[in-house]
């Protein structure tokens, strides 16, 4: 009989967080983020308490599920590492994703074409997504944010303490959040593991794909290159002057009339 201990969902999620370095904070510490910091390493980096990260993740998922229309939830990421994660989160939960630059006035200026009226806003980083967080305060829209140890908590209603600068950490946090939302909605039972891998939420550099394609093209065998002067030599014409190669009686045969019997 195996003595392997079966991990609870909380232990399994925290183990994944450790692998993706969700607990690694920064050397700077925001005063309001002290409650989420477990300790400080010798190199000055603050270590985030993953137990509180898991609790805030569960709370955020319940708030997202409470919104009746999933399209009223907007997920924002101005940071490139979070662009693929927010798009995948929106794909599986039905939310709206805004990856890249935030157009000023999307929540406050009704004249612009991109004006939206969401009921909930999720941001990847309150610092890089400061414009959207500020506009949500004007429009009275609650905000859920992935907050590092140095992130400002102004106008943030639910802060999920985590490393919001690493691409593995961002991908895992959105994957866990999407998984919990699907569990609460009943889309997938809790007894069943989600068949979507975390790699689907992971950001990939387009330049790496181009370099990989170039390497594959160089490794592909090609036809041997022919020299430019290979076909530049003249064909031999001495044999054309020999009369033996020609039939001298050809002209006389052509002059003979064709009879009907031959047809």
From Swiss-Prot:
HAMAP family: Ribosomal_S2_euk (MF_03015). Keywords: Cytoplasm, Ribonucleoprotein, Ribosomal protein. It is found in: Cytoplasm. Required for the assembly and/or stability of the 40S ribosomal subunit. Required for the processing of the 20S rRNA-precursor to mature 18S rRNA in a late step of the maturation of 40S ribosomal subunits. One of its GO terms (cellular component) is cytosolic small ribosomal subunit. The keyword Cell membrane does not apply. Belongs to the universal ribosomal protein uS2 family. This is Small ribosomal subunit protein uS2. Pfam families: Ribosomal_S2 (PF00318). Coiled coil: none annotated. It comes from Plasmodium yoelii yoelii. One of its GO terms (molecular function) is structural constituent of ribosome. NCBIfam families: uS2_euk_arch. InterPro entries: Ribosomal_uS2, Ribosomal_uS2_CS, Ribosomal_uS2_euk, Ribosomal_uS2_euk/arc, Ribosomal_uS2_flav_dom_sf. Component of the small ribosomal subunit. Mature ribosomes consist of a small (40S) and a large (60S) subunit. The 40S subunit contains about 33 different proteins and 1 molecule of RNA (18S). The 60S subunit contains about 49 different proteins and 3 molecules of RNA (25S, 5.8S and 5S). Interacts with ribosomal protein S21. The keyword Cell wall biogenesis/degradation does not apply. One of its GO terms (biological process) is ribosomal small subunit assembly. Residues 237-263 are annotated as: Disordered.
């Amino acid at each position: 009989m195996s003595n392997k201990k079966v991990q609870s969902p909380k232990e399994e999620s925290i183990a994944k967080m450790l692998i993706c370095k969700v607990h690694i904070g920064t050397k700077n510490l925001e005063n309001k983020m002290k409650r989420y910091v477990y300790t400080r390493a010798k190199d000055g980096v603050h270590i985030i308490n993953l137990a509180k990260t898991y609790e805030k993740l569960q709370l955020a998922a319940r708030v997202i599920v409470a919104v009746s229309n999933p399209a009223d939830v907007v997920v924002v990421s101005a940071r490139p590492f979070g662009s693929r994660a927010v798009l995948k989160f929106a794909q599986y939960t039905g939310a709206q994703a805004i990856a890249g630059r935030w157009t000023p006035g999307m929540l406050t200026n009704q004249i612009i074409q991109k004006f939206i009226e969401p009921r909930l806003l999720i941001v990847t980083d309150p610092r890089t997504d400061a414009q959207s967080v500020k506009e949500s305060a004007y429009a009275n829209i609650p905000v859920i944010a992935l907050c590092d140890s140095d992130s400002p908590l102004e106008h943030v209603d639910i802060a999920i303490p985590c490393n919001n600068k690493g691409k593995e950490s961002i991908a895992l946090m959105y994957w866990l959040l999407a998984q919990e939302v699907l569990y609460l909605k009943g889309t997938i039972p809790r007894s069943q593991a989600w068949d979507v891998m975390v790699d689907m939420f992971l950001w990939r550099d387009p330049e790496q794909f181009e370099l990989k394609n170039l390497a594959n093209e160089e490794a592909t065998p090609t036809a041997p290159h022919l020299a430019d002067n290979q076909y530049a030599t003249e064909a031999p014409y001495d044999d054309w002057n020999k009369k033996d190669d020609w039939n001298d009686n050809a002209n006389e045969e052509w002059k003979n009339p064709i009879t009907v019997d031959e047809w």
